[in-house]
Design a protein with these regions (language model features):
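Non-catalytic helical/linker scaffolds that mediate oligomerization, partner binding
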Residues: 1-110
Length: 111
């Protein structure tokens, strides 16, 4: 059996690993996405902005990657909203490239 857990903030990562998670997933919604689309067009299935269910800064993602390197439990980033409009794909690509550049390479993608 594989335990997969949703991460709401980077502070939860170590607790999830210690509790036995084999894999973690999270949403990353940078400011540039929120500024342009807000939650009218969410980036993933966790559409709320004002609760602790999204990571919102690249600096936090860099810290999370360092934790992944230490604890060896992978993190998958979600881009799995029900649909995207054509103009969003360029920004999604940029966001994914930013994440790849800091070491993330597993994504859940839907359109």
């Amino acid at each position: 059996m594989k335990i997969v857990a949703g991460l709401g903030c980077i502070d939860d990562y170590i607790r999830l690993v210690q509790a036995g998670a084999d894999e973690v997933f999270c949403g990353y919604v940078p400011y540039e996405w929120n500024k342009k689309y807000g939650n009218l067009f969410p980036l993933n299935r966790r559409e709320v902005l004002y609760y602790n269910v999204q990571i919102s800064s690249l600096e936090d993602m860099k810290i999370l990657k360092k934790m992944v390197d230490v604890y060896k439990v992978p993190v998958t980033i979600t881009f799995n909203y029900l649909y995207y409009i054509d103009e969003q794909f360029e920004l999604i690509e940029k966001i994914m490239k930013d994440l790849i550049n800091i070491g993330f390479n597993e994504f859940i993608v839907a359109d």
